[in-house]
Amino acid sequence: MVYVLRWIKDYLEPVIIEAVKGSPYPVDQLAAMACRETGWKIEKYLNQKLPYATICEIMKGDYGQRAGDAEKIYHGFGFWQIDIGSYPEFVKSGNWKDPLKCCQMAVNVLETKRKYFLNKTPGLKGDPLERAVTAAYNCGEGNVFKALINHRDVDFYTFNHDYSKAVWGFRETYKDLK
């Protein structure tokens, strides 16, 4: 994934820097989240030699049929996989194709999760809070709260049970890129 993280640094870091201004989220966190959310798709598209603009236009994922869907559809949009079920207006606007707008939306989603945990778990601070917020980006704050009150890891309900752990690993690799 170093190759993908390098691409994220080269192509997405400028928009990430802009999107996180004034927020508590560091650049490496949003870069690592993009890698966790869409790194495999980025790698696939780079192997196909697709240009950046094309990748921005076609970055969709989480294809399947959820309860309530009439048929299979994409549920995640943009490098940060904004969920159509949670943010339909944003997705339908097409703003997910603009990396800056998509990253700003990801920051807004994280901030919603942060406010939830600051309200529901005022004793949660520092790295445990940041991991909870990050895990909630993947599986929802209710699931992470349920994990916490049952003394489980914040990633218990995340995809592959490792979302925030994987993001933290990608963060460390990203920080080491020159």
Question: At which residue positions do the language-model features occur?
Answer:
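Catalytic metal-binding/acid-base residues of hydrolase active sites
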Residues: 34-39, 138
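Histidine-centered catalytic micro-motifs used for acid/base chemistry in nuclease
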Residues: 31
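Conserved alpha-helical segments that form or flank metal/cofactor-binding pockets of metalloenzymes
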Residues: 37-71
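Non-catalytic cell-wall polysaccharide-engagement segments
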Residues: 2-23, 59-178
